[in-house]
């Protein structure tokens, strides 16, 4: 519950608000006084972000701070930190009304000790929900949710500047509500209930809703947009929207900035909250260059929207990235590689913030004794980029077809076969038919023309039985495509 006086170790609410806005006010005032250091003087991404008046954050596992290279980068390159797992429900309330804040407090202490803004993640999420909570129903479940939100937000009051109050409320495809325990037991109203409880517990923290696959303008982001618009119209306390941005190399939505702007126009802040850009491994110079360009696009999209607060990457090093465990054969998604070497994305982010990186001598990576595998080959004409988000026995595929020939394609059919018995259950921006493992995808009425060098995109939901290997061969209008 709200306190009338701050508890020991908590600054007064007004003091916390002033501290939270210091960086952006300082950036504005210093520029106004014309004494700001030139952008070229930035030697770290933190300095570049500070100079741009934006956050640049990372997801922290406090157990890794004992690793010298990890801590050195964490200390110097970021001005915001978010707990990767330490503030989620299973970590903070493993049994009913028995709270455990040890790991979360370590993250909060680290933020305070290093002068970083602390971002809270997450109060209500259907994943990592303890079994005891899943077994509750009706009013008991709602009371447990409100109690959890209240106790956790109250504990970190004065330390957390912003909270992901509700995470991943919408499903993929047409953007219906996520079929979660919260939705099943409490219906649509649970989101509003959670936000009102969070505001009551901490009246000055910014309250955010956070989701994935909403970076472009699509059915899912439209559902999120409609909810935010409704909340703002009715005075529900929602201050910001987080765009997770777990992206795939070469597939940054072209309307990312426009999407951020339309949410900002509703009167909320926006931020990029969990950025990583994965590729098929092993990496190579071409993939890393494309990844760098993609990181730059994402940061530039934020920089072009006044109410975009900043960018957070979901980890520091590829060594500890979540990606390979969830997407076998993919990875290399972060700004530092598994040996803590800066990748080309580092300089790209620096430039997007408006600074120029300071060159640092590097030792060339030894040439591997085993040649890098060559991507699946085919005649110059088409390329397919295959991206998947998967869970238990389901998945969502997002597919980009690129016309690499010198002539336009007018009407297209893409064919491939599933290697592991997968089944398509729902498709969009296309017409999909399946016979056994063979899948045929035909264009929708609006995306049948692909100019030379242009792309068409479609997606579908599917089911699998535990193995979800990606197709290895595609043909467009009978011509084999490369896979990249």
Swiss-Prot record:
Record bears the keyword Disulfide bond: yes
Any GO BP annotation: xylan catabolic process
SUPFAM superfamilies: (Trans)glycosidases, Carbohydrate-binding domain
The keyword Signal is assigned to this record: yes
Disulfide pairings: 208-240, 302-308, 382-481
Active site: residue positions: 168 (proton donor), 274 (nucleophile)
Assigned EC number: 3.2.1.91, 3.2.1.8
Sequence segments annotated as region (Disordered): 357-377
Compositionally biased intervals (Pro residues): 358-376
Residue ranges constituting the CBM2 domain according to the UniProt record: 375-484
Signal sequence interval, chain numbering: 1-41
PANTHER family: BETA-XYLANASE (PTHR31490:SF88), GLYCOSYL HYDROLASE (PTHR31490)
Note from the entry: The linker region (also termed 'hinge') may be a potential site for proteolysis.
Name assigned to this protein: Exoglucanase/xylanase
Protein species of origin: Cellulomonas fimi
